[in-house]
């Protein structure tokens, strides 16, 4: 990313002086160390795995009697 686009506080402004977007919409969703869609996908899979483990445990083991 270009350093000349950054403001005094280090953030990238939404618009350039001519009114055009400072960052294209394709790059806005993939900025940062990890893309947000990747974090959300891994988090969702973890939640589904834990819920599946609880359902599996309800049919087997101590609580199944």
Swiss-Prot record:
Gene Ontology cellular component annotations, sorted alphabetically: photosystem II reaction center; plasma membrane-derived thylakoid membrane
Gene Ontology biological-process annotations: photosynthesis
Membrane topology label: Single-pass membrane protein
Presence of keyword Nucleotide-binding: no
Transmembrane spans: 36-56
UniProt biased composition (Basic and acidic residues): 1-17
Annotated Gene3D superfamilies: 6.10.250.2070
Disordered: annotated span: 1-21
Protein name: Photosystem II reaction center protein J
Gene encoding the protein: psbJ
């Amino acid at each position: 990313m270009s350093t000349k686009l950054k403001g005094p506080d280090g953030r990238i402004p939404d618009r350039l002086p001519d009114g055009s977007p400072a960052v294209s919409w394709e790059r806005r969703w993939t900025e940062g160390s990890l893309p947000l869609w990747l974090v959300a996908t891994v988090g969702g899979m973890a939640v589904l795995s834990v819920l599946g483990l609880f359902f599996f445990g309800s049919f087997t083991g101590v609580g199944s009697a």
